[in-house]
Amino acid sequence: LPPSSAASDVYKRQVVSLNAPGFIGNRMLFGYTAQANMLLLEGALPHQIDQALESFGLNMGPFRMMDLVGLDLGWRARKLSGKESPLHAKIGDELCEQNRYGQKNGAGYYNYTEGSRAPNAAPENEELYERISQENGFTRREISDEEIVDRCILALINEGANILSEGVAQRAVDIDVVYINGYGFPIWRGGPMHHANAMGLDVVVEKLNKYKELTGNDVYKPSELLVSLAENNLKMGDAPAKADRKEKLGFEMSSVANNF
């Protein structure tokens, strides 16, 4: 069967991706979850972050998702390789040191009762959050739901633009198809690239610069593609196709480096 027929037979949607680390969806997810963890270090709590993003329309917030997948996967890999925990993984790795691995053993960012996947608050973790934040130079602060949504969704949008400019994805709509069908992005928002258009690319660039100044994190350094499209009053769908698409077996980027 041709690929399109095979995909349809198992009720899947397909897009073409360059052979590259993380492909499209997971590469964007790395930066998204890293920023959720940075918000936790800075003062927000898991349930607040999850509720803000679920209110935006995502099927599942990042901390519920990480508990579902298992907090110990990256932690065990880092221990085996002798790598130090990256900043955004400090809290998750410390939870693992305390045998809190997520749903698999009933305790992670949330607590779980036997036989249930419903998350319950874990106030006993808050002392750990305070300690890890302080040890890493953060004074915890009040963080608004607006900042939570902005920082997590902008991380997706900016990395999506980088993926598009590198030719890893051929079209902005392909990125939207991946995120709506595979990552729980709200269909009524059209996907992260369509949502960027709805926000206005000039607004997206302005907000990215704002959070780059606030956090110093290069994940918010506006993609050159975004800047160019915004300056020319264009949309994500107007991005020029990349003719010399070659597989990328490695790359350097702030949102992916040291995630594992």
Question: For each predicted feature, which ranges?
Answer:
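Single conserved hydrophobic/aromatic residue that forms the stacking wall/gate
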Residues: L1-A7, Y11
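Substrate-binding/catalytic subdomain of NAD(P)-dependent oxidoreductase enzymes
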Residues: Q14-F260
